[in-house]
Amino acid sequence: MRKKSSSNKEETALHPPPENFETATAELEQIVAGMETGQMSLEDALSAYKRGVELLQYCQNILKNSQQQIKILEADMLKHFSPAEHDAS
């Protein structure tokens, strides 16, 4: 029986973090396409699923941080639009 801790270390070494959001989404699309073929062994499918979860979490984190940055940047620039104000101009 394999030790869990060494297995986790091996998977981390095999799957480095993605370079950026676009790289992560491209890899995720490849994983999904590979799994949809139905040609993967159960072990390979499970490994691919785990990597997919890692990539999804990475992408969600990037999107969340980006949304927060946009809200901060737009905080002073956003004004409520009123058609009456626009027509008066």
Curated annotation (Swiss-Prot):
Gene3D superfamilies: Exonuclease VII, small subunit (1.10.287.1040)
Major site of localization recorded for this protein: cytoplasm
A GO CC term attached to the entry: cytosol
InterPro entries listed in its UniProt record: Exonuc_VII_S, Exonuc_VII_ssu_sf
Subcellular location: Cytoplasm
EC id: 3.1.11.6
Catalysed reactions, as listed in the record: Exonucleolytic cleavage in either 5'- to 3'- or 3'- to 5'-direction to yield nucleoside 5'-phosphates
Location of region: Disordered: 1-22
One function term, GO molecular function aspect: exodeoxyribonuclease VII activity
GO biological process terms held by the UniProt record: DNA catabolic process
Entry keywords, A to Z: Cytoplasm, Exonuclease, Hydrolase, Nuclease
Pfam families: Exonuc_VII_S (PF02609)
Keyword Nuclease: yes
Similarity-based family: Belongs to the XseB family.
HAMAP family: Exonuc_7_S
Subunit comment: Heterooligomer composed of large and small subunits.
NCBIfam families reported for this sequence: PRK00977.1-5 (NF002141), xseB (TIGR01280)
Function in brief: Bidirectionally degrades single-stranded DNA into large acid-insoluble oligonucleotides, which are then degraded further into small acid-soluble oligonucleotides.
PANTHER family per record: EXODEOXYRIBONUCLEASE 7 SMALL SUBUNIT
Name this protein carries in UniProt: Exodeoxyribonuclease 7 small subunit
Gene: xseB
